Amino acid sequence: MSKLSRLSFMMFLEFFIWGAWLPLIFGYLPSLGFSPSEQAWILNAFPIAAIVGMFFSNQFADRNFSAEKFLAVSHIIGGAAILGCGFVDTFWPFFVLMLVHCLLYVPTISITNSIAFSHIDDPKKNFPIIRTGGTLGWITAAIPFTFILVDWESVNAADTNGFIAWLGTVLDSGLTGDAMKDATRWTYVAAGVASFVLAAFSLFLPHTPPNKVEIGTNRSQAWLESAKLLRHPFIAVLFIVTFADSFVHNCYFNWTGRFLGASVEDGGVGIASNWIMPVMTVGQVAEILTMLVLGVVLKKLGWRWTMVIGVMGHAARFAAYAFFPEYQSLIILIQVLHGVCYAFFFATVYIFVDAYFPKDARSSAQGLFNLMILGLGALAANSICPFLFDKVYTNNGVIDFQGLFTVPLVCASVAAISLALFFKPPEVSVESAIDDDTV
């Protein structure tokens, strides 16, 4: 296996793990009887780990261990933890196992990037290919559950004639109730097994030694210098909008699965439970295609309008959720906007930071925006979304999906308008753009 193939397969497994359990956890936790506050604690294990990672664990791992060995150990322990989540149904064991998994998994996201960048000669050419392996891993994680989450008793009772008729029945016979809850446990088993496979495979990755800190290097000073850059209005605006967009992005994950699976009579889309994960992966397929045209779009539209389109993609999707849930084909098709939202905003933010921040502050600046994207924005959404769903927009068991989706719709619209009106970066894309105090 070539080096590029090994690095791509590393990314495939890395994101298969995350993609296996994330889409269905938001409906699984309520099915276990967890309260909104308990759901919030479990869901916030990931952003808490992201925040800890940005300030401590990522740097600790990067400086003290060879990357491939850290990856192996993290996925052995983290894999056991996520595997255990499939066999517990009380709050404290589930929360502790999820927290252990996330504390070990989150640093591996940056570690896999470090391994990849350390062993490719042309990052601009090769890294997108390697990273696409991660997107394919996320998509692939959904495929087995199209069949695992099938109500096979109903399929057998249907007594269909011919393979095509049988397959149609299979694909339209999703599990419900306790049967769905029990089958969802397999998402954690799949994530755990993939973790063990990646742990073993890590030993065959190219050796990546720890990064030694040069004498006189002050990491906290670099963070402080990056934070000082928020005094520039265009960076402050982008920072705030990034928080809002991350909040909206995580509303999508919190609510979409349950919305897709709810019956039409209850205001949902009525998609069979075994199709929820595949439908949500439409966005990942679109992400691959959107990333291919991102460079062209940036040249044509520039930073501001590319990002505005990315944020407005959320608004358009949630508008469809709120006002056209009865159009199942539209709801499925509009999942492509997930890829547009990711590429045109999050990916563009990373590129923007690389273009505008001074070289000695870029790494910390990326971390600063990651704090919003993976940390604080997700933390806010995971804290608020379960409460809004269960306590504010559910009355006597009836969910007001229109009111629920109006929240991220308004939030995304305000963020996009703010970006359009107040985000005015300098015309130049070099370090002097923010070194100059007159900016």
Each model region followed by its residue ranges:
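Juxtamembrane intracellular "pre-TM" segments in multi-pass secondary transporters
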Residues: 1, 176, 205-241, 265-268, ...
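A membrane-interface helix-boundary motif in multi-pass transporters
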Residues: 150-193, 387-412
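Helix-loop boundary and gating motifs at the non-cytosolic
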Residues: 1-47, 234-242, 246-266, 275-279, ...
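Helix-to-loop junctions at the C-terminal end of transmembrane segments
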Residues: 52-66, 149-150, 289-303, 389-390
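Multi-pass alpha-helical transporter architecture, strongest
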Residues: 85-86, 194-206, 404-439
